[in-house]
Every structure is written in structure tokens, then in C-alpha cells.
Amino acid sequence: PLARARCRLAAAEIALVTRDLGGLERALGTARGALAAQGDWANAAHAGYLQARLLLLTGRLDQAEAVLETLDAAALPPASRPGCWLVAAGIAMRRIRAGDARAALDRAARAAHQPGIAALAAEVAQARAAFDAPAGRLIESGRETLLDLAGVEALLGADLLLVDACRNLLRGGATLVPLAGRPVLMALLRALAEAWPGDAPRETLLARAFRARHADESHRARLRVEIGRLREHLSPLAGIKATGRGFVLEPCGGRRIAVLAPPVEGDHAGLLALLADGEAWSSSALALALDVSPRSVQRGLKALERAGRVEWLGHGRARRWVARSVPGFPTGLLLPAPVPMR
């Protein structure tokens, strides 16, 4: 039974590295339980670390953190300890906690130095480069500024109305207005915020929200309806006033308005964020990690392939997708942590 459990763990680790994620969570849980039952605490701890890594990869941050808390760090093999701290750093980065992420990266670097394995040191260096890369863009009064993770964290705590285009919501102090399921309202809000303190012309709003090149009366009528819906969502944080040429945001309490946008935007940014780890991914694993349908992933991959951003290896079920070249591609805000509903 012990040898079989170790073989299952090895197979699960290979599956994780090759991004063959189907059924992997159950396989790791089974292997971890069997190894612990046989008293193989080192490999059981290693299986727990792999569980946390998988949960982070698929965006389940609370579960990943809970698994890390159950691990006995002393039981972990020396080669597993840097990765364990990298998982902790990844959780902190996704939650926009720069200090916690930096501390975890420092511990990962110290842990990687002990076994003297060059590949571990390289993995830590790659994670630190991702931490140091721009994590977001501040758009305010017509100006754009790149922010690192600490800058994003400070912005989220500032006393302003922040249109968070990474998580599709409006932040005003402790109040959150989620708009993730309302792309038209989010597009209108962002256009209004980017124009503030001025007004946004109706033509701009129609183009941003409805992609209408030649607006007719039906488009204008729909715009009035959607602006009315947006007013209801923004109260009591802000109002929307009609002007001669469009609409303008009116924040309550004299707060200023800014937009937090991802450092890189465009269609299928989430796919590129995952592929930026340099691994070869199956389309099914990408769908699992992004929590979208396989058909949506296939369409996105085909579009990225036509644009020269990705390429594939293998055929049929063995096909894997890789990014062609995206050095330093920042992923932190492209794969955000879930935001609690108001």
C-alpha cells in the first residue's frame, strides 16, 4: 500500500506539472490520506503542498490557505519548502497583500538556498519578478500611472471612488457595488469615470457599451435605460447627471474618482495570464482554472493563435497550448480573488 500511494503521488505531481488537472484534486487527497495512514509524513506533507498549489492554480484561495495551515512545515522535504512558501506568496498576491507576499517570497528564497537546487532558485526568482512587475494601471483625470502590487494595495485603501476594472465593481470605502454580471453597466461606469471630472459624450458611451459605430434612436433610447439602471446601482455612492452632450458622474461627499485597470488589457487576457507560467496547458485544464466552458476556451485559443500569441503541440487529447513569448507578463490582477457581494 505504501509503494502504491507513493506511485500515485508521483503520477499526480506529473499531472500537475503537465497541467492535466482532471480528477487531480481527488487523486492528491487519496494519496495524502494513504501516505499519512502509513506514517510517511514527508510525502504526505508533500502531497498537501501539491494540493495547495492546485487550489491556488484554480483560484480557490481560501481552500489553498486552509490546506497550508494544516501542513507540518518540519515534515516537508527540503525541496518542497520553497514551493510551499511560493504558494503562500501567490495567495497574498492574488489578495493584493504586498507585505505578506514579500515576506513569503523572502522565506521561499531562504528555503531554496538550503538544498542548493538551481531550479528552485530560478522558480523563486521568477515569482519575485512577477511580484515586482506592474500589477495595475491608475487612470485618473486623463492620466495613466503604472502601479506595483504595493501601489495597488494603497489605492484600494484610499478614500476615493474607485472603479475597479479588474474585478468589475465600484469601491467606495467599505461599500462595494459589484457589476461583474452586468458588462454594459460596467462599460458605462468606466467610460464615465475616465471622463471625470468632465462629462462623457453620448457617442463615446454608445461605442463603449454597445459598440455602436452609427447610433440611431433605438441606441439612444437603450442608453437612457441603461444609465437609469446604473444610477440605481451607484446610489448612494454617486449620481449621474445629464449634460448637453452626454452624462457626468457626481460623487457623493466630494470624493475624487479613479479607475484601476489591469496592466495589460485585451480579449482573452485570462488565458494569457495562465499560459504566462511557461507550462504547456490542455484546453480542459484552462477551462477548469478559469471556470469557463471548454468551448469558450477553444474559441479564445483559436483567436490567440491567429494573433500569433499562442501555439499548440500534439494532437487530439494530447494537444497542449503554450504562450509564444510573454516575458514578464503580469498576472496578478488578471486572475483576481473573488470579491464578496454587498
Language-model segments: residues:
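Positively charged, aromatic-enriched patches within helix-turn-helix-type DNA-binding elements
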Residues: 188, 192-222
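Alpha-solenoid helical repeat architecture
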Residues: 1-11, 19-23, 35-51, 59, ...
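Short boundary/linker motifs that mark transitions into or out of structured domains
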Residues: 121, 126-186, 190, 232, ...
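Short, amphipathic alpha-helical interaction segments positioned at domain boundaries
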Residues: 255-269, 326-342
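Alpha-helical linker/edge segments of TPR/alpha-solenoid repeat scaffolds
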Residues: 17-20, 52-53, 57-60, 89-98, ...
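DNA-binding patch around the recognition helix
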Residues: 216, 220-258, 302-322
